[in-house]
Every structure is written in C-alpha cells, then in structure tokens.
C-alpha cells in the first residue's frame, strides 16, 4: 500500500480506481493517465488547475533578480522564469491535521 512507502504513485491511483469503481486495470490506468495529461496540458498552456476540495496548481511569473554564488560571493543575474506552486485547499489541510 502507498502508506507503507510514503509515496502515492500513478500505479497506486490506478489500482484505487480499479478497486473503487470497478473498471478494468487497463481502463483505470487510462483514466488516471488522461486526468494527469489534461492537467499537464492546461499548465503548459499557462492555465491554473483547481481541484475543489484538494487544492490549486498555480503558475507564477518570477522576474529577473540578482543572485549570489555562495562559494565566491559574485553576483549573478537570475533570468525571469515561470514556476509552479501548489496551494492545498482548507479541506485538505484540515484532513492532514486531523490525520484522516
């Protein structure tokens, strides 16, 4: 089970869909892959992804800034970039705190 490893994988999600909904293992894997693919495509297009009761994957633009090489102390420009952040919903945060 995923809790034994500490990491939930695609295979674990597919197996849960198979057990809970009763789809074949192949169909369950296809459903999981399609959901993840749609999420990835939306993010690649610059869209945020919000899953009610779970959380939001939010794209943010970071501007150029000056960083510093920790070994030499030399200032180095860091190019602007797009970063992905995740914000858990209040419902998910409450479930994590309560442990169920």
Curated annotation (Swiss-Prot):
The keyword DNA-binding applies. Keywords: DNA recombination, DNA-binding, Transcription, Transcription regulation, Translation regulation. CDD domains: IHF_A. The keyword tRNA processing does not apply. HAMAP family: IHF_alpha. This protein is one of the two subunits of integration host factor, a specific DNA-binding protein that functions in genetic recombination as well as in transcriptional and translational control. Belongs to the bacterial histone-like protein family. This is Integration host factor subunit alpha.
């Amino acid at each position: 089970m995923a809790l034994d490893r500490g990491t939930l994988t695609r295979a674990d999600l597919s197996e849960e869909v198979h057990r809970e909904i009763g789809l074949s293992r192949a169909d369950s894997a296809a459903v999981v892959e399609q959901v993840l693919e749609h999420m990835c495509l939306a993010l690649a297009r610059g869209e945020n992804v919000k899953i009610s009761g779970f959380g939001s994957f939010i794209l943010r633009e970071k501007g150029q800034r000056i960083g510093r090489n920790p070994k030499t102390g030399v200032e180095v420009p860091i190019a602007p970039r797009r970063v992905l952040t995740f914000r858990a919903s209040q419902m998910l945060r409450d479930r994590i705190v309560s442990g169920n």
